[in-house]
Amino acid sequence: MNDERVTARVVPVLERAANGDVVLNERSGASEDFSFMLNDVPGQFFFLGVVPRDQELATAAPNHSPNFFVDEKALIVGVRALAMATVNYLAASKTD
């Protein structure tokens, strides 16, 4: 699962990228194979919430449903978060 040191460094970056709109959940591997990579390489896995703000999460269609709907504004946040996390990681690796 997520490396604690990487997570401690990434969460503040995600909070800046999402203007503080970050929810920390219990650990979950869901059905992602990414967790296997984290056995060998320290990293951090996170979910990007894409359900529209005016829709209850409980009523949202799941990923593989033909009714799945993505609030495309969330994609901008996701790209910003990944870019900022990458820049943060590269800057920190120069000083480590």
Segments predicted by a language model, with ranges:
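Metal-dependent amide/peptide-bond hydrolase catalytic core
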Residues: M1-D96
